[in-house]
Curated annotation (Swiss-Prot):
Specific enzymatic cleavages in vivo yield the mature SU and TM proteins. Has been mainly detected in vivo as an 65 kDa unprocessed polyprotein precursor. Contains the CKS-17 immunosuppressive domain present in many retroviral envelope proteins. As a synthetic peptide, it inhibits immune function in vitro and in vivo. Gene3D superfamilies: 1.10.287.210. It comes from Homo sapiens. It comes from the Eukaryota. A motif (CX6CC) lies at residues 565-574. Belongs to the gamma type-C retroviral envelope protein family. HERV class-I R env subfamily. This is Endogenous retrovirus group 3 member 1 Env polyprotein. Glycans are attached at N64, N105, N201, N316, N369, N382, N399, N527, N569.
Length: 604
Protein backbone atom coordinates (compact mmCIF):
# COMPACT_ATOMS: atom_id res chain seq x y z
CA UNK A 1 0.00 0.00 0.00
CA UNK A 2 1.61 3.23 -1.13
CA UNK A 3 1.92 6.02 1.40
CA UNK A 4 -0.09 9.18 1.40
CA UNK A 5 2.97 11.42 1.15
CA UNK A 6 6.21 10.75 -0.71
CA UNK A 7 8.98 13.15 0.31
CA UNK A 8 12.36 13.70 -1.28
CA UNK A 9 15.88 14.58 -0.20
CA UNK A 10 18.44 15.70 -2.80
CA UNK A 11 21.88 14.10 -2.40
CA UNK A 12 25.15 15.74 -3.39
CA UNK A 13 27.45 13.05 -2.03
CA UNK A 14 27.20 9.32 -2.66
CA UNK A 15 28.39 7.04 0.12
CA UNK A 16 29.51 3.39 -0.23
CA UNK A 17 26.72 0.87 0.27
CA UNK A 18 27.06 -2.11 2.58
CA UNK A 19 24.45 -4.64 1.51
CA UNK A 20 24.35 -6.52 4.80
CA UNK A 21 20.87 -7.72 5.65
CA UNK A 22 19.65 -6.53 9.03
CA UNK A 23 22.38 -3.88 9.38
CA UNK A 24 22.10 -0.16 8.56
CA UNK A 25 23.06 0.58 4.96
CA UNK A 26 24.91 3.87 4.95
CA UNK A 27 23.58 6.33 2.40
CA UNK A 28 20.38 4.43 1.48
CA UNK A 29 21.65 4.19 -2.10
CA UNK A 30 19.15 1.45 -2.92
CA UNK A 31 16.40 4.09 -2.50
CA UNK A 32 18.35 6.77 -4.36
CA UNK A 33 17.10 7.43 -7.89
CA UNK A 34 18.03 9.68 -10.77
CA UNK A 35 15.47 12.47 -11.08
CA UNK A 36 15.00 15.45 -13.35
CA UNK A 37 13.97 18.91 -12.21
CA UNK A 38 13.76 20.87 -15.40
CA UNK A 39 17.02 20.18 -17.22
CA UNK A 40 18.94 19.43 -14.02
CA UNK A 41 19.69 15.80 -13.15
CA UNK A 42 20.08 15.01 -9.46
CA UNK A 43 20.26 12.00 -7.17
CA UNK A 44 17.15 11.91 -4.98
CA UNK A 45 16.30 9.75 -1.99
CA UNK A 46 12.66 8.68 -2.30
CA UNK A 47 10.82 7.46 0.78
CA UNK A 48 7.30 7.10 2.17
CA UNK A 49 6.09 8.43 5.47
CA UNK A 50 3.28 5.82 5.54
CA UNK A 51 3.84 2.45 3.92
CA UNK A 52 2.79 -1.14 4.56
CA UNK A 53 5.45 -3.59 3.41
CA UNK A 54 3.71 -6.44 1.59
CA UNK A 55 7.04 -8.06 0.65
CA UNK A 56 10.16 -8.70 2.72
CA UNK A 57 11.48 -6.26 5.31
CA UNK A 58 15.27 -6.13 4.79
CA UNK A 59 16.21 -4.01 7.77
CA UNK A 60 17.17 -0.34 7.92
CA UNK A 61 19.38 2.18 6.17
CA UNK A 62 20.79 5.50 7.35
CA UNK A 63 21.14 8.82 5.57
CA UNK A 64 21.74 12.27 7.04
CA UNK A 65 21.25 11.09 10.65
CA UNK A 66 17.87 9.57 9.70
CA UNK A 67 17.07 5.85 9.75
CA UNK A 68 14.63 4.34 7.23
CA UNK A 69 13.06 0.89 7.10
CA UNK A 70 13.69 -0.96 3.83
CA UNK A 71 11.14 -3.14 2.03
CA UNK A 72 11.64 -5.48 -0.92
CA UNK A 73 8.23 -5.56 -2.70
CA UNK A 74 9.36 -8.48 -4.87
CA UNK A 75 8.54 -9.16 -8.54
CA UNK A 76 11.62 -7.20 -9.58
CA UNK A 77 10.35 -3.91 -8.16
CA UNK A 78 12.87 -1.49 -6.62
CA UNK A 79 13.40 -1.33 -2.88
CA UNK A 80 11.19 1.05 -0.91
CA UNK A 81 12.38 3.18 2.02
CA UNK A 82 9.75 4.18 4.56
CA UNK A 83 9.05 5.16 8.18
CA UNK A 84 11.82 7.77 8.71
CA UNK A 85 13.14 8.06 12.26
CA UNK A 86 15.84 10.26 13.65
CA UNK A 87 18.94 8.28 14.55
CA UNK A 88 20.17 8.45 18.15
CA UNK A 89 22.76 11.17 18.57
CA UNK A 90 25.15 12.51 21.18
CA UNK A 91 24.28 15.85 22.74
CA UNK A 92 26.10 18.13 25.16
CA UNK A 93 23.87 20.24 27.40
CA UNK A 94 24.54 23.08 29.84
CA UNK A 95 22.04 23.53 32.66
CA UNK A 96 21.98 26.24 35.31
CA UNK A 97 22.02 25.03 38.91
CA UNK A 98 21.52 21.29 38.49
CA UNK A 99 20.81 18.53 36.01
CA UNK A 100 17.12 19.47 36.08
CA UNK A 101 17.83 23.21 35.97
CA UNK A 102 17.11 25.62 33.14
CA UNK A 103 18.70 24.55 29.86
CA UNK A 104 21.27 27.18 28.93
CA UNK A 105 22.36 25.69 25.61
CA UNK A 106 22.87 22.40 23.81
CA UNK A 107 24.70 21.09 20.77
CA UNK A 108 24.72 17.84 18.84
CA UNK A 109 28.01 16.05 18.26
CA UNK A 110 28.31 14.82 14.68
CA UNK A 111 30.61 11.90 13.85
CA UNK A 112 32.94 14.11 11.81
CA UNK A 113 36.18 13.31 13.60
CA UNK A 114 36.32 16.57 15.61
CA UNK A 115 37.87 16.18 19.05
CA UNK A 116 36.34 19.29 20.66
CA UNK A 117 32.80 20.48 21.37
CA UNK A 118 31.79 24.14 21.61
CA UNK A 119 28.83 25.76 23.32
CA UNK A 120 28.21 29.42 23.93
CA UNK A 121 26.28 31.36 26.56
CA UNK A 122 25.96 34.89 27.87
CA UNK A 123 27.44 35.74 31.27
CA UNK A 124 24.65 38.17 32.09
CA UNK A 125 22.09 35.51 31.23
CA UNK A 126 23.45 32.90 33.64
CA UNK A 127 23.75 35.52 36.38
CA UNK A 128 20.08 36.42 36.00
CA UNK A 129 19.04 32.74 35.88
CA UNK A 130 20.77 31.25 38.91
CA UNK A 131 23.01 33.50 41.01
CA UNK A 132 23.57 32.33 44.61
CA UNK A 133 24.51 35.85 45.69
CA UNK A 134 22.55 39.08 45.15
CA UNK A 135 23.30 40.58 41.77
CA UNK A 136 24.43 44.13 42.47
CA UNK A 137 24.86 45.09 38.83
CA UNK A 138 21.81 45.48 36.61
CA UNK A 139 22.31 48.70 34.67
CA UNK A 140 22.46 48.82 30.90
CA UNK A 141 26.03 50.04 31.22
CA UNK A 142 26.92 46.64 32.67
CA UNK A 143 25.00 44.73 30.02
CA UNK A 144 26.67 46.67 27.21
CA UNK A 145 30.24 46.25 28.49
CA UNK A 146 31.09 44.08 25.54
CA UNK A 147 34.59 45.56 25.08
CA UNK A 148 35.85 44.28 28.45
CA UNK A 149 36.94 40.83 29.52
CA UNK A 150 34.28 38.38 30.62
CA UNK A 151 35.24 35.92 33.31
CA UNK A 152 33.73 32.62 34.38
CA UNK A 153 35.71 30.50 36.84
CA UNK A 154 35.31 28.07 39.78
CA UNK A 155 34.93 30.02 42.99
CA UNK A 156 37.06 29.10 46.01
CA UNK A 157 34.12 27.96 48.10
CA UNK A 158 30.41 28.44 48.31
CA UNK A 159 30.82 30.41 51.55
CA UNK A 160 33.23 33.02 50.23
CA UNK A 161 32.08 36.21 48.56
CA UNK A 162 32.63 36.17 44.84
CA UNK A 163 34.88 39.24 44.81
CA UNK A 164 37.51 37.54 47.02
CA UNK A 165 38.02 34.49 44.83
CA UNK A 166 39.36 35.82 41.56
CA UNK A 167 42.92 34.72 42.31
CA UNK A 168 41.92 31.04 42.00
CA UNK A 169 40.60 31.41 38.47
CA UNK A 170 40.97 28.20 36.46
CA UNK A 171 38.86 28.92 33.39
CA UNK A 172 38.75 32.51 32.17
CA UNK A 173 38.62 34.44 28.94
CA UNK A 174 42.03 36.09 29.34
CA UNK A 175 44.31 33.12 30.00
CA UNK A 176 45.10 29.68 28.67
CA UNK A 177 42.97 26.78 29.85
CA UNK A 178 44.26 24.74 32.77
CA UNK A 179 41.57 22.06 32.65
CA UNK A 180 39.18 20.21 30.30
CA UNK A 181 37.38 23.45 29.40
CA UNK A 182 38.51 26.57 27.56
CA UNK A 183 36.62 29.89 27.60
CA UNK A 184 36.84 32.38 24.75
CA UNK A 185 35.39 35.88 24.54
CA UNK A 186 33.05 36.40 21.57
CA UNK A 187 33.31 39.90 20.01
CA UNK A 188 29.93 41.50 19.39
CA UNK A 189 28.56 44.73 17.99
CA UNK A 190 28.31 47.78 20.30
CA UNK A 191 24.54 48.03 19.74
CA UNK A 192 23.87 44.54 21.14
CA UNK A 193 20.72 43.73 23.07
CA UNK A 194 20.27 42.68 26.69
CA UNK A 195 21.67 39.20 27.50
CA UNK A 196 23.60 39.10 24.21
CA UNK A 197 26.47 41.50 24.93
CA UNK A 198 28.72 39.30 27.07
CA UNK A 199 28.85 36.04 25.17
CA UNK A 200 31.40 33.38 26.02
CA UNK A 201 32.32 30.31 23.98
CA UNK A 202 32.83 27.24 26.18
CA UNK A 203 34.99 24.62 24.47
CA UNK A 204 35.14 21.07 25.80
CA UNK A 205 38.63 19.86 24.91
CA UNK A 206 38.15 16.14 25.60
CA UNK A 207 34.48 15.27 24.92
CA UNK A 208 35.13 11.50 25.04
CA UNK A 209 36.07 11.51 28.74
CA UNK A 210 33.69 9.47 31.00
CA UNK A 211 33.17 12.48 33.27
CA UNK A 212 30.81 14.09 30.74
CA UNK A 213 28.49 11.07 30.68
CA UNK A 214 27.84 11.30 34.41
CA UNK A 215 27.84 15.09 34.29
CA UNK A 216 30.11 17.80 35.67
CA UNK A 217 28.68 20.28 38.17
CA UNK A 218 31.03 23.25 38.05
CA UNK A 219 30.76 26.12 40.58
CA UNK A 220 31.43 29.24 38.54
CA UNK A 221 31.92 32.85 39.41
CA UNK A 222 31.13 35.45 36.78
CA UNK A 223 31.96 39.11 36.27
CA UNK A 224 32.31 41.46 33.34
CA UNK A 225 35.18 43.78 34.18
CA UNK A 226 38.62 42.19 34.22
CA UNK A 227 40.53 45.39 34.92
CA UNK A 228 39.80 45.58 38.61
CA UNK A 229 37.94 43.67 41.28
CA UNK A 230 34.36 44.47 40.53
CA UNK A 231 30.91 43.12 41.22
CA UNK A 232 30.12 39.57 40.25
CA UNK A 233 27.86 36.61 40.81
CA UNK A 234 28.16 32.95 41.74
CA UNK A 235 26.35 30.19 39.85
CA UNK A 236 26.49 26.47 39.16
CA UNK A 237 26.80 25.15 35.62
CA UNK A 238 25.93 21.50 35.02
CA UNK A 239 27.51 20.07 31.85
CA UNK A 240 26.37 16.62 30.73
CA UNK A 241 26.70 14.36 27.69
CA UNK A 242 23.52 12.54 26.61
CA UNK A 243 22.45 10.11 23.91
CA UNK A 244 18.95 10.87 22.75
CA UNK A 245 16.72 10.89 19.68
CA UNK A 246 14.90 13.84 18.23
CA UNK A 247 11.73 13.29 16.22
CA UNK A 248 12.20 13.81 12.50
CA UNK A 249 10.42 16.96 11.31
CA UNK A 250 8.55 16.07 8.13
CA UNK A 251 7.03 19.40 7.21
CA UNK A 252 8.37 22.93 7.21
CA UNK A 253 7.15 25.15 10.03
CA UNK A 254 6.39 28.78 9.33
CA UNK A 255 9.27 30.86 10.63
CA UNK A 256 7.17 34.02 10.53
CA UNK A 257 3.42 34.03 11.02
CA UNK A 258 3.06 37.46 9.46
CA UNK A 259 5.20 36.47 6.49
CA UNK A 260 2.88 33.53 5.90
CA UNK A 261 -0.46 35.28 6.27
CA UNK A 262 0.67 38.21 4.13
CA UNK A 263 1.29 35.92 1.17
CA UNK A 264 -1.47 36.31 -1.37
CA UNK A 265 -3.27 33.07 -2.07
CA UNK A 266 -4.20 32.30 -5.68
CA UNK A 267 -7.79 33.17 -6.39
CA UNK A 268 -9.71 29.87 -6.41
CA UNK A 269 -12.06 29.41 -9.35
CA UNK A 270 -15.81 29.14 -8.69
CA UNK A 271 -15.89 25.47 -9.71
CA UNK A 272 -13.20 24.64 -7.17
CA UNK A 273 -14.88 26.49 -4.29
CA UNK A 274 -16.58 24.23 -1.81
CA UNK A 275 -17.89 24.28 1.72
CA UNK A 276 -16.54 21.69 4.10
CA UNK A 277 -19.99 20.72 5.32
CA UNK A 278 -21.19 20.11 1.78
CA UNK A 279 -18.07 18.13 0.93
CA UNK A 280 -18.36 16.00 4.07
CA UNK A 281 -22.00 15.30 3.23
CA UNK A 282 -21.08 14.29 -0.32
CA UNK A 283 -18.31 12.01 0.96
CA UNK A 284 -20.62 10.28 3.44
CA UNK A 285 -23.29 9.91 0.76
CA UNK A 286 -20.91 8.60 -1.90
CA UNK A 287 -19.17 6.11 0.38
CA UNK A 288 -22.37 5.12 2.20
CA UNK A 289 -20.81 5.63 5.63
CA UNK A 290 -22.36 6.80 8.88
CA UNK A 291 -21.36 7.26 12.52
CA UNK A 292 -17.90 8.57 11.69
CA UNK A 293 -15.94 11.80 11.41
CA UNK A 294 -14.83 13.23 8.07
CA UNK A 295 -11.46 14.77 8.89
CA UNK A 296 -9.04 16.96 6.98
CA UNK A 297 -6.30 19.52 7.46
CA UNK A 298 -6.52 23.25 7.95
CA UNK A 299 -8.10 24.97 4.93
CA UNK A 300 -6.53 28.38 4.41
CA UNK A 301 -8.87 29.46 1.63
CA UNK A 302 -12.42 28.74 0.57
CA UNK A 303 -11.47 25.63 -1.38
CA UNK A 304 -10.77 22.15 -0.10
CA UNK A 305 -7.15 20.86 -0.41
CA UNK A 306 -6.66 18.07 -2.92
CA UNK A 307 -4.26 15.15 -3.27
CA UNK A 308 -2.99 13.77 -6.57
CA UNK A 309 -1.90 10.38 -7.90
CA UNK A 310 -0.27 9.65 -11.25
CA UNK A 311 -2.06 7.29 -13.62
CA UNK A 312 0.29 4.38 -14.32
CA UNK A 313 0.12 2.22 -17.48
CA UNK A 314 -0.66 -0.88 -15.40
CA UNK A 315 -3.51 0.80 -13.48
CA UNK A 316 -6.94 -0.72 -14.05
CA UNK A 317 -8.56 2.51 -15.19
CA UNK A 318 -12.10 1.91 -16.41
CA UNK A 319 -12.31 3.11 -20.00
CA UNK A 320 -15.67 4.39 -21.11
CA UNK A 321 -16.77 6.23 -24.19
CA UNK A 322 -16.64 9.50 -22.27
CA UNK A 323 -13.14 8.87 -20.87
CA UNK A 324 -11.71 8.19 -24.34
CA UNK A 325 -12.70 11.66 -25.46
CA UNK A 326 -11.46 14.92 -23.96
CA UNK A 327 -13.46 16.43 -21.14
CA UNK A 328 -15.45 19.60 -21.80
CA UNK A 329 -13.21 22.61 -22.00
CA UNK A 330 -12.54 24.06 -18.55
CA UNK A 331 -9.86 26.41 -17.24
CA UNK A 332 -10.36 25.47 -13.59
CA UNK A 333 -7.31 24.93 -11.40
CA UNK A 334 -7.18 22.66 -8.36
CA UNK A 335 -4.55 23.48 -5.74
CA UNK A 336 -2.86 20.38 -4.35
CA UNK A 337 -1.83 19.82 -0.75
CA UNK A 338 1.39 18.00 -1.68
CA UNK A 339 3.48 17.56 -4.79
CA UNK A 340 4.13 14.11 -6.21
CA UNK A 341 7.13 12.60 -7.99
CA UNK A 342 6.28 11.78 -11.60
CA UNK A 343 7.37 8.60 -13.37
CA UNK A 344 6.14 9.44 -16.87
CA UNK A 345 6.32 13.23 -17.18
CA UNK A 346 5.87 15.37 -20.25
CA UNK A 347 7.92 18.55 -20.21
CA UNK A 348 8.72 21.42 -22.51
CA UNK A 349 10.41 24.79 -22.19
CA UNK A 350 11.52 27.42 -24.65
CA UNK A 351 10.68 30.71 -26.30
CA UNK A 352 7.57 29.30 -27.96
CA UNK A 353 6.09 28.17 -24.63
CA UNK A 354 5.19 31.18 -22.52
CA UNK A 355 2.53 29.98 -20.04
CA UNK A 356 4.16 28.29 -16.99
CA UNK A 357 1.89 25.73 -15.32
CA UNK A 358 4.21 24.20 -12.73
CA UNK A 359 7.21 21.92 -12.31
CA UNK A 360 7.55 18.30 -11.15
CA UNK A 361 10.48 16.24 -10.01
CA UNK A 362 10.46 13.31 -12.44
CA UNK A 363 11.98 9.84 -12.55
CA UNK A 364 11.32 9.72 -16.29
CA UNK A 365 10.72 12.66 -18.60
CA UNK A 366 9.48 12.95 -22.18
CA UNK A 367 10.69 16.44 -23.09
CA UNK A 368 10.93 18.71 -26.09
CA UNK A 369 14.49 19.64 -27.04
CA UNK A 370 14.21 23.10 -28.56
CA UNK A 371 17.76 23.01 -29.92
CA UNK A 372 17.24 19.76 -31.83
CA UNK A 373 13.60 20.51 -32.57
CA UNK A 374 12.30 17.08 -31.51
CA UNK A 375 10.87 15.16 -28.56
CA UNK A 376 13.24 12.94 -26.54
CA UNK A 377 13.07 10.69 -23.46
CA UNK A 378 15.40 10.67 -20.49
CA UNK A 379 15.29 8.46 -17.42
CA UNK A 380 18.37 7.26 -15.56
CA UNK A 381 20.39 8.88 -18.34
CA UNK A 382 19.85 10.98 -21.45
CA UNK A 383 20.18 7.89 -23.62
CA UNK A 384 17.39 5.87 -22.01
CA UNK A 385 14.81 4.25 -24.27
CA UNK A 386 11.32 5.73 -24.33
CA UNK A 387 8.65 3.47 -22.77
CA UNK A 388 6.66 1.44 -25.26
CA UNK A 389 3.74 1.59 -25.61
CA UNK A 390 3.40 5.18 -24.49
CA UNK A 391 1.55 5.95 -21.23
CA UNK A 392 -1.04 7.81 -23.37
CA UNK A 393 -1.71 4.89 -25.71
CA UNK A 394 -5.19 4.36 -24.22
CA UNK A 395 -6.24 7.89 -25.16
CA UNK A 396 -6.33 8.51 -28.92
CA UNK A 397 -6.54 12.29 -28.52
CA UNK A 398 -3.26 12.36 -26.56
CA UNK A 399 -1.21 9.46 -27.93
CA UNK A 400 0.33 11.44 -30.80
CA UNK A 401 1.24 14.28 -28.40
CA UNK A 402 3.50 11.93 -26.44
CA UNK A 403 5.82 11.69 -29.45
CA UNK A 404 5.40 15.28 -30.65
CA UNK A 405 5.08 17.60 -27.67
CA UNK A 406 5.48 20.66 -29.87
CA UNK A 407 2.52 19.75 -32.08
CA UNK A 408 -0.66 21.84 -31.65
CA UNK A 409 -3.21 20.24 -29.35
CA UNK A 410 -6.11 21.27 -27.15
CA UNK A 411 -4.38 19.52 -24.20
CA UNK A 412 -7.67 18.56 -22.61
CA UNK A 413 -7.47 15.76 -20.06
CA UNK A 414 -9.73 12.72 -20.57
CA UNK A 415 -12.87 12.56 -18.46
CA UNK A 416 -12.02 11.80 -14.83
CA UNK A 417 -8.33 12.66 -15.24
CA UNK A 418 -6.28 15.82 -14.72
CA UNK A 419 -2.95 17.29 -15.68
CA UNK A 420 -0.88 17.36 -12.48
CA UNK A 421 1.82 20.02 -12.71
CA UNK A 422 3.56 20.50 -9.36
CA UNK A 423 1.20 22.09 -6.82
CA UNK A 424 -1.65 22.56 -9.33
CA UNK A 425 -3.94 20.29 -11.32
CA UNK A 426 -5.71 21.30 -14.55
CA UNK A 427 -8.53 19.95 -16.66
CA UNK A 428 -6.98 21.63 -19.67
CA UNK A 429 -3.51 23.03 -20.26
CA UNK A 430 -2.97 26.32 -22.09
CA UNK A 431 -1.94 26.04 -25.73
CA UNK A 432 1.52 27.48 -24.95
CA UNK A 433 2.02 25.73 -21.62
CA UNK A 434 5.50 25.41 -20.16
CA UNK A 435 6.67 23.11 -17.38
CA UNK A 436 6.48 19.42 -16.41
CA UNK A 437 3.23 17.48 -15.89
CA UNK A 438 1.81 13.98 -15.57
CA UNK A 439 -1.66 12.60 -16.21
CA UNK A 440 -3.46 11.41 -13.09
CA UNK A 441 -6.36 11.61 -10.68
CA UNK A 442 -7.11 13.91 -7.78
CA UNK A 443 -9.28 13.50 -4.71
CA UNK A 444 -10.11 15.65 -1.69
CA UNK A 445 -7.57 15.39 1.09
CA UNK A 446 -9.56 13.75 3.88
CA UNK A 447 -9.76 10.63 6.00
CA UNK A 448 -12.50 8.93 7.98
CA UNK A 449 -12.37 8.30 11.72
CA UNK A 450 -14.79 6.20 13.79
CA UNK A 451 -16.63 8.02 16.55
CA UNK A 452 -14.79 6.10 19.26
CA UNK A 453 -11.37 7.21 17.99
CA UNK A 454 -12.59 10.79 17.76
CA UNK A 455 -12.86 10.93 21.52
CA UNK A 456 -9.06 10.80 21.73
CA UNK A 457 -8.58 14.03 19.76
CA UNK A 458 -7.07 17.06 21.47
CA UNK A 459 -10.26 19.14 21.29
CA UNK A 460 -13.27 17.97 23.33
CA UNK A 461 -15.80 16.19 21.15
CA UNK A 462 -19.38 16.04 22.35
CA UNK A 463 -21.24 12.86 21.52
CA UNK A 464 -24.94 13.52 21.12
CA UNK A 465 -25.82 9.84 21.26
CA UNK A 466 -23.87 8.98 24.40
CA UNK A 467 -25.26 9.74 27.81
CA UNK A 468 -23.70 9.36 31.20
CA UNK A 469 -24.50 5.95 32.58
CA UNK A 470 -26.84 6.03 35.55
CA UNK A 471 -27.66 3.40 38.08
CA UNK A 472 -30.69 1.48 36.99
CA UNK A 473 -33.24 -0.12 39.33
CA UNK A 474 -32.21 -3.75 39.51
CA UNK A 475 -33.29 -6.57 41.74
CA UNK A 476 -31.10 -8.96 43.69
CA UNK A 477 -27.70 -7.39 42.84
CA UNK A 478 -27.02 -6.16 46.37
CA UNK A 479 -25.52 -7.90 49.33
CA UNK A 480 -27.95 -9.05 51.99
CA UNK A 481 -27.14 -6.19 54.36
CA UNK A 482 -26.89 -3.38 51.76
CA UNK A 483 -29.88 -1.11 51.14
CA UNK A 484 -29.25 1.57 48.50
CA UNK A 485 -32.17 3.85 47.45
CA UNK A 486 -33.08 1.64 44.48
CA UNK A 487 -33.49 -1.44 46.70
CA UNK A 488 -35.56 0.49 49.23
CA UNK A 489 -37.99 1.58 46.51
CA UNK A 490 -38.17 -1.88 44.97
CA UNK A 491 -38.75 -3.58 48.32
CA UNK A 492 -41.28 -1.29 49.97
CA UNK A 493 -43.26 -0.04 47.00
CA UNK A 494 -45.57 3.02 47.19
CA UNK A 495 -47.41 3.89 50.40
CA UNK A 496 -51.06 2.78 50.84
CA UNK A 497 -53.64 4.42 53.06
CA UNK A 498 -56.88 3.39 54.77
CA UNK A 499 -60.11 4.20 53.00
CA UNK A 500 -60.98 6.90 55.56
CA UNK A 501 -57.55 8.47 55.13
CA UNK A 502 -56.61 8.29 58.80
CA UNK A 503 -52.90 7.57 59.22
CA UNK A 504 -53.42 6.19 62.69
CA UNK A 505 -54.42 2.88 61.20
CA UNK A 506 -50.78 2.33 60.21
CA UNK A 507 -48.10 1.18 62.61
CA UNK A 508 -45.09 3.34 63.49
CA UNK A 509 -42.80 0.85 61.73
CA UNK A 510 -44.84 1.23 58.55
CA UNK A 511 -44.60 5.03 58.73
CA UNK A 512 -40.85 4.85 59.36
CA UNK A 513 -40.44 2.69 56.27
CA UNK A 514 -42.42 5.23 54.24
CA UNK A 515 -40.08 8.01 55.39
CA UNK A 516 -37.05 5.95 54.44
CA UNK A 517 -38.55 5.31 51.03
CA UNK A 518 -39.36 9.00 50.56
CA UNK A 519 -35.76 9.80 51.34
CA UNK A 520 -34.59 7.35 48.68
CA UNK A 521 -37.04 8.73 46.12
CA UNK A 522 -35.81 12.25 46.82
CA UNK A 523 -32.20 11.24 46.16
CA UNK A 524 -33.04 9.55 42.86
CA UNK A 525 -35.18 12.46 41.66
CA UNK A 526 -32.37 14.84 42.60
CA UNK A 527 -29.83 12.82 40.60
CA UNK A 528 -32.12 12.67 37.56
CA UNK A 529 -32.82 16.42 37.75
CA UNK A 530 -29.12 17.21 38.12
CA UNK A 531 -28.35 14.98 35.13
CA UNK A 532 -30.89 16.84 33.00
CA UNK A 533 -29.43 20.21 34.03
CA UNK A 534 -25.92 19.00 33.21
CA UNK A 535 -27.07 17.97 29.73
CA UNK A 536 -28.55 21.43 29.19
CA UNK A 537 -25.29 22.99 30.39
CA UNK A 538 -23.29 20.86 27.94
CA UNK A 539 -25.62 21.81 25.11
CA UNK A 540 -25.24 25.50 25.97
CA UNK A 541 -21.45 25.13 25.97
CA UNK A 542 -21.53 23.50 22.53
CA UNK A 543 -23.80 26.23 21.18
CA UNK A 544 -21.39 28.81 22.55
CA UNK A 545 -18.47 27.14 20.73
CA UNK A 546 -20.43 26.97 17.48
CA UNK A 547 -21.40 30.66 17.69
CA UNK A 548 -17.80 31.67 18.35
CA UNK A 549 -16.57 29.56 15.43
CA UNK A 550 -19.17 31.03 13.08
CA UNK A 551 -18.31 34.55 14.20
CA UNK A 552 -14.60 33.81 13.72
CA UNK A 553 -15.28 32.50 10.21
CA UNK A 554 -17.35 35.58 9.32
CA UNK A 555 -14.66 37.92 10.62
CA UNK A 556 -12.04 35.99 8.61
CA UNK A 557 -14.03 36.15 5.38
CA UNK A 558 -14.77 39.85 5.93
CA UNK A 559 -11.28 40.74 7.15
CA UNK A 560 -10.75 43.30 4.38
CA UNK A 561 -13.93 45.08 5.49
CA UNK A 562 -12.95 45.09 9.20
CA UNK A 563 -15.06 42.07 10.06
CA UNK A 564 -18.77 41.85 10.73
CA UNK A 565 -18.86 45.16 12.60
CA UNK A 566 -17.16 47.03 9.77
CA UNK A 567 -19.28 45.35 7.10
CA UNK A 568 -22.57 46.57 8.61
CA UNK A 569 -21.14 49.74 10.16
CA UNK A 570 -22.24 48.81 13.67
CA UNK A 571 -21.20 51.23 16.39
CA UNK A 572 -22.08 48.89 19.25
CA UNK A 573 -20.80 45.55 18.05
CA UNK A 574 -20.33 43.10 20.87
CA UNK A 575 -20.34 39.36 21.25
CA UNK A 576 -20.63 38.13 24.82
CA UNK A 577 -21.49 34.51 25.43
CA UNK A 578 -20.66 33.61 29.00
CA UNK A 579 -20.02 29.95 29.65
CA UNK A 580 -22.10 29.24 32.75
CA UNK A 581 -21.99 25.51 32.21
CA UNK A 582 -19.29 25.04 34.82
CA UNK A 583 -21.28 27.02 37.38
CA UNK A 584 -24.39 24.93 36.70
CA UNK A 585 -22.42 21.73 37.14
CA UNK A 586 -21.04 22.98 40.45
CA UNK A 587 -24.57 23.75 41.66
CA UNK A 588 -25.91 20.36 40.61
CA UNK A 589 -22.96 18.67 42.31
CA UNK A 590 -23.85 20.44 45.57
CA UNK A 591 -27.50 19.37 45.19
CA UNK A 592 -26.49 15.76 44.63
CA UNK A 593 -24.14 15.86 47.59
CA UNK A 594 -26.86 17.30 49.81
CA UNK A 595 -29.42 14.67 48.82
CA UNK A 596 -27.02 11.71 48.81
CA UNK A 597 -27.44 9.08 51.51
CA UNK A 598 -24.74 6.40 51.75
CA UNK A 599 -25.78 2.78 51.29
CA UNK A 600 -27.55 1.69 54.49
CA UNK A 601 -27.04 -1.59 56.31
CA UNK A 602 -28.96 -3.14 59.15
CA UNK A 603 -26.19 -1.96 61.45
CA UNK A 604 -26.60 1.67 60.35
Amino acid sequence: MLGMNMLLITLFLLLPLSMLKGEPWEGCLHCTHTTWSGNIMTKTLLYHTYYECAGTCLGTCTHNQTTYSVCDPGRGQPYVCYDPKSSPGTWFEIHVGSKEGDLLNQTKVFPSGKDVVSLYFDVCQIVSMGSLFPVIFSSMEYYSSCHKNRYAHPACSTDSPVTTCWDCTTWSTNQQSLGPIMLTKIPLEPDCKTSTCNSVNLTILEPDQPIWTTGLKAPLGARVSGEEIGPGAYVYLYIIKKTRTRSTQQFRVFESFYEHVNQKLPEPPPLASNLFAQLAENIASSLHVASCYVCGGMNMGDQWPWEARELMPQDNFTLTASSLEPAPSSQSIWFLKTSIIGKFCIARWGKAFTDPVGELTCLGQQYYNETLGKTLWRGKSNNSESPHPSPFSRFPSLNHSWYQLEAPNTWQAPSGLYWICGPQAYRQLPAKWSGACVLGTIRPSFFLMPLKQGEALGYPIYDETKRKSKRGITIGDWKDNEWPPERIIQYYGPATWAEDGMWGYRTPVYMLNRIIRLQAVLEIITNETAGALNLLAQQATKMRNVIYQNRLALDYLLAQEEGVCGKFNLTNCCLELDDEGKVIKEITAKIQKLAHIPVQTWKG
